[in-house]
């Protein structure tokens, strides 16, 4: 057995693809409010573009309402402008240093578009997992060719890699199904 091949590293890299997928899906707008919806927004603050999370606190007081508590009173207008200009179709109402954002219902056409986007994200995650699998299998073949591992070890380890791949792709599919159900629920 050699230390050059590490199944834990393969699994970690595959899990990274799932984590990335979950982050991307979190940014997809559904009918419900989610603080992650505003994560990609940057605010022109203090002469630089800063993530919204660095100038305000985002909370979800109700299922269809986001509350953005701006820390600096002078930044309220900049935060409001950034949210309006974000192409998310959101319209904040200002109350002092707090912005309240109602999340409107999604129409059926928009829901279907979001499902398509979710499928693209999931496919990208599957491709990433397959790339990790290919890298692992290539390394195993190289180790076997260099006589660093026996053919029995090669077969056993390749089954481990395939099992990890199958489990990870199954997790991607489950994550996608959950998000799709969330998007399509009215």
From Swiss-Prot:
It is found in: Cytoplasm. It comes from the Bacteria. Pfam families: RRF. InterPro entries: Ribosome_recyc_fac (IPR002661), Ribosome_recyc_fac_dom (IPR023584), RRF_sf (IPR036191). Keywords: Cytoplasm, Protein biosynthesis. GO terms for cellular component: cytosol. GO terms for molecular function: ribosomal large subunit binding. One of its GO terms (biological process) is cytoplasmic translational termination. Responsible for the release of ribosomes from messenger RNA at the termination of protein biosynthesis. May increase the efficiency of translation by recycling ribosomes from one round of translation to another. NCBIfam families: frr. Belongs to the RRF family. This is Ribosome-recycling factor. It comes from Azorhizobium caulinodans (strain ATCC 43989 / DSM 5975 / JCM 20966 / LMG 6465 / NBRC 14845 / NCIMB 13405 / ORS 571).
């Amino acid at each position: 057995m050699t230390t050059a091949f590490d199944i834990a590293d393969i699994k970690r890299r595959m899990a990274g693809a799932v984590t990335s997928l979950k982050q991307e899906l979190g940014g997809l707008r559904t009918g419900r409010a989610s603080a992650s919806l505003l994560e990609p927004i940057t605010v022109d603050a203090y002469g630089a573009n800063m993530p919204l999370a660095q100038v305000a606190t985002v909370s979800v007081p109700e299922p269809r309402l986001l509350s953005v508590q701006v820390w600096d009173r002078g930044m309220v207008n900049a935060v409001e402008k950034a949210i309006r200009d974000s192409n998310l179709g959101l319209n904040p109402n200002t109350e002092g240093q707090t912005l309240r954002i109602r999340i409107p219902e999604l129409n059926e056409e928009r829901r279907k578009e979001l499902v398509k986007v979710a499928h693209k994200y999931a496919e990208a995650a599957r491709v990433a997992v397959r790339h990790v699998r290919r890298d692992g299998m290539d390394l195993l073949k190289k180790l076997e060719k260099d006589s660093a591992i026996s053919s029995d070890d090669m077969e056993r380890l390749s089954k481990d890699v395939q099992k990890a791949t199958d489990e990870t792709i199954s997790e991607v599919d489950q994550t996608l199904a959950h998000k799709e159900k969330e998007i399509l629920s009215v």
